[in-house]
Amino acid sequence: MDTAEIRRRFLNHFSERGHTVVPSASLVAQDPTLLLVNAGMVPFKPYFLGDLKAPWNRATSVQKCVRTVDIDNVGRTARHASFFQMCGNFSFGDYFKAEAIPFAFELIVDGYGFNPDDLWATVYLDDDEAEAIWRTLLPAERIQRRGKKDNFWSMGVPGPCGPCSEIYFDRGPAYGREGGPEADEDRYLEIWNLVFMQFARGEGSEYGYEIVGDLPARNIDTGMGLERMATILQGVENLYEIDISRPVLDAAGRLTGTRYGADPDSDVRLRVVADHTRTAAMLISDGVSPSNEGRGYVLRRMLRRAVRDARLLGAREPVMDELFGVVRAAMGPIYPELVDQAEAITAVAVAEETAFLETLRTGTTLFDTAVTQARSSGSSQLSGESAFRLHDTYGFPIDLTMDMAADAGLTVDEAGFRRLMERQRQAAKADRASRRIGNLDLSAFRPILAASGPTTFTGYTELGRESGIVGIVGIGDGDSLTAAGEGEEVGILLDATPFYAESGGQEADLGRIRFDGGEAEVLDVQRPVPDLVMHRVKVLGGELRVGADVFAEVDVERRRAVSRSHTATHLVHTAFRRALGESATQAGSLNSPGRLRFDFHALGAVPDSVLADVEDEVNEIALRDLEVRWYVTSQEEARRLGAMALFGEKYGDRVRVVDVGDYARELCGGTHVASSAQLGAIKLLSESSISAGTRRVEALVGMDAFRFLAREHVLVSQLSSTLKARPDELADRVADIVGRLRDAEKELERLRAQAVLAGSAALAAGAEDVGGVALVTAQVPAGTPADDVRLLALDVRGRLAGRPAVVAVVEAAGAAVVVATDETARTRGLRAGDLVRHSWAALGGKGGGKPDVAQGGRGDADMIPKVFARLRELVADQSA
């Protein structure tokens, strides 16, 4: 039975039993505590927590999931994978154990054809009800009771929890010993977990918490791994060999010249390549881009591990382009976004692969040096400093360094690496924390939402309105408050608001909230939970109270400026897609007053000619005074109309479409101008790379663009006057001047070197004999560049060829010293680095270097005689 059929039967089974089929949510979790969706219930979490009322009593889904906690086991076991699909059925206060258990059993036996004699069930230690239900389906000897660790589910924090029941398939004596799941979980494979959410848990350790009460409603959350079920039904040894995974595995073998099944170690690497490639494709299709933080780092790690293992298996050419094509063919029928965005998805992967291959080429040399140093010092550990340098200079993720070190038989000082990383992050982290709402305790918002309902947003049609305060929370701790006085910063929630909360790349509205006896300044607007808008305010006077009537007033000029930027972003997006192709999709944006930042997918730098064409096109569209209108329609109708959906975004059944005439049509929830003429001018400022496969354009809009162009005009006029050239001649005139200046600098450098070396012969001739070593000590005028000091020292050393020689040249103010030794002197133990350290550095300066030449600085003029005397002593002692 192929995977598509297993999936179809699952959804049909529950649809026929009154469940609404819910499409898979994006892998990008909406839950702020998660980077990625890692379980089938995650999209339903607000309903289980009571934050929102579920729109259905029963639901079923096949949810995309990524889990990296066991990444080191990927490829090594039959059941670990970083990407998987979780089939689930859910009840929100409707049915419970008496229905959930038979629902699952019927599908397994009647739908998938399992022999009931091969099935086992486990229940929680005290769950008599679940065991009684199972006894109507299975003999008592194939039902086992297990403790909290195995059969009691919680989210790890105070909240919903409950016992669970797991269904196991007995693979037979060839896979292990008898005795059921508690005896051998390799033989008895878990295929379905049924969670009965009925209690609330309190604080405590992973398994040491207390049950503090019953939930208002009893819920069902179940999960059946699609890939694991396919492994059994297709009769293969592991989930890498099922119908949607095997083609990727085979392609990896072909591209690396490795036959799967020939060598256990090679098989592990092939499975890693296949698994990580599939995971990466799914992440990119949901809008994740490679980066060094968060979910972007997860993606980068996956791609780089896949590329490295492919290289170790023998790949000599890039492999991602072809592997992604195989993933697309295998998974595209279920996930059409893989096909719709094929070019853009592959471009991201290929760009990251190209960048990483260069990283491997340059960084491996440093890594090999670090390994040699560790071994020569008798250590079995790579230093944290080396790991940090590999990360900071060459972009080596720490896990890659650890993998490579393990291959070399070494460990890594991970704690030392983390300390250096933390030190580097502190300043940026503190700055970010001070600029955002903070990590609020979201529990304060649940009673507000339950009592008052969702915040009504009216800002599409009005910029001021009367409203009522339904809640006040403390900033930082999220504590629920009843009032806030002058000077306090708090979060307030209104029953309706014209303020746009930051989202979709558009900055939040600012403004004022006025009330009887005072007013508050709105500093930020966010959505801490779905359906609630929180206004971060500073009370300027009076006292805000829950229940008070207020007038919410948006800063009109700022809103208009932000709206201009947002509409301009739509034009820029369309223009780049027209110029570069459909793969130039948006990867991110920021719309602020008078300025926009637009990130898009592209393999390389955009030519200046294309940037000029894009700028011309968007300004021409602005001048055409096209109507900008918005409307709400079904997602299906929006796609039929050709509306552009942003790469990686997920939309509901009803979507808001924004049209700019017949030029641009995009799904968007932001605010916009009424016509393109209101944009004024659009001026592209820069184009740059922000990561492999992603480019960034920054632009000014409206009066900000006009002011910039006016300043540019004044500057051009001044340059034309100064250089006595017409504006169209300025580039050639400046290039000519720069060329002549460069020639003059080269000549000056030649003359300066000639002057510095003028006394070289005399210095060599006057060398002092110290124990058979020619010692030269010399000063050069204050202000002589360090490079010239070095040049003189090396030239004098060259003139003393054939004699053991030590040459020390010092800039008269003590800013630079260079010591050079010849090979014969070094055989006597006179190494330049040691001489600098024991003379210059020992007397207060800074310095060191290699055995043949070393350099120092940060000294003063008074040190120089002492340094020369110390050098004589060192040479004499070593020559004795």
UniProtKB/Swiss-Prot annotation:
The keyword Metal-binding applies. Coiled coil: none annotated. Zn(2+) binds at residues 566, 570, 668, 672. Its EC number is 6.1.1.7. Gene3D superfamilies: 2.40.30.130, 3.10.310.40, 3.30.54.20, 6.10.250.550, Bira Bifunctional Protein, Domain 2 (3.30.930.10), Threonyl-trna Synthetase, Chain A, domain 2 (3.30.980.10). It catalyses: tRNA(Ala) + L-alanine + ATP = L-alanyl-tRNA(Ala) + AMP + diphosphate. Consists of three domains; the N-terminal catalytic domain, the editing domain and the C-terminal C-Ala domain. The editing domain removes incorrectly charged amino acids, while the C-Ala domain, along with tRNA(Ala), serves as a bridge to cooperatively bring together the editing and aminoacylation centers thus stimulating deacylation of misacylated tRNAs. This is Alanine--tRNA ligase.
